[in-house]
From Swiss-Prot:
CDD domains: bZIP_HLF. The keyword DNA-binding applies. The keyword Repressor applies. Residues 144-172 are annotated as: Leucine-zipper. Residues 111-152, 201-211 have a biased composition (Basic and acidic residues). Keywords: Apoptosis, DNA-binding, Nucleus, Repressor, Transcription, Transcription regulation. Residues 116-179 form the bZIP domain. InterPro entries: bZIP, bZIP_sf, PAR_bZIP. It comes from Caenorhabditis elegans. This is Transcription factor ces-2. Belongs to the bZIP family. Residues 83-101, 190-200 have a biased composition (Low complexity).
Length: 211
């Protein structure tokens, strides 16, 4: 059943439709006028108006929608607020700028009228303290240099001892090998003599057997 037939069936039975619309809480007072308008529009081939006040998406007002330009403006306004600018400056200064070391104050020349005895006494104490500091630093550097010289000299002595011990070990090794080699030659000579005597005894025994 198409839409035209459904509307015509509802329009013909208005007495039954009216209490149903009232029981459902239909927002319009006159249900027959809605049905009549819908039926006339459907029969004429016109586009139906929305009877319940529901607007299509295209006809909705676009004031509440965020367009790209409005979004950019909103972000600019948020960035321009004092709280965000303060937090951004604090964060940027905390992460980007390195921590500066405390710089020394520029020396300001003291006028002649202020150079009294207390000033000269303070200058003398400062000069004495600076001299003591220089002397202590120089003494410490001299101690380090003398200690390094003593360690280098001890290192050279130890290297000389190591080389002399290596030479002595080489000489002892040579003497050990030279003592082992004559003993081996004597053992070989004794073995040769024993083999010769055995051969001579064997030849004598053979000659006696032949006689």
């Amino acid at each position: 059943m198409d839409f035209h037939r459904a509307l015509s069936a509802l329009f013909t039975n208005q007495a039954a439709v009216q209490p149903l619309l009232g029981s459902l809480g239909f927002p319009f007072n006159d249900g027959t006028s809605i049905l009549t308008t819908a039926l006339a529009a459907q029969s004429g081939g016109k586009k139906l108006d929305t009877p319940l006040g529901i607007l299509p998406f295209d006809s909705l007002p676009t004031t509440n929608l965020l367009t790209p330009t409005k979004k950019i403006k909103l972000e600019d306004e948020l960035c321009a607020s004092p709280v965000s600018s303060r937090s951004s400056t604090v964060s940027s200064s905390h992460f980007s700028s390195p921590q500066r070391s405390p710089s020394r104050k520029m020396s300001v020349p003291i006028p002649e009228e202020k150079k009294d005895s207390a000033y000269f006494e303070r200058r003398r104490k400062n000069n004495d303290a600076a001299k003591r500091s220089r002397d202590a630093r120089r003494q410490k550097e001299e101690q380090i240099a003398s200690k390094a010289h003593a360690l280098e000299r001890e290192n050279m002595q130890l290297r000389g001892k190591v080389s002399s011990l290596e030479q002595e070990a080489a000489q002892l090794r040579f003497l050990l090998f030279s003592k082992i080699s004559p003993a081996n030659s004597e053992v070989s000579c004794e073995s040769n003599d024993s083999t010769e005597t055995n051969d001579s005894n064997d030849s004598k025994s053979d000659s006696t057997i032949e006689v």
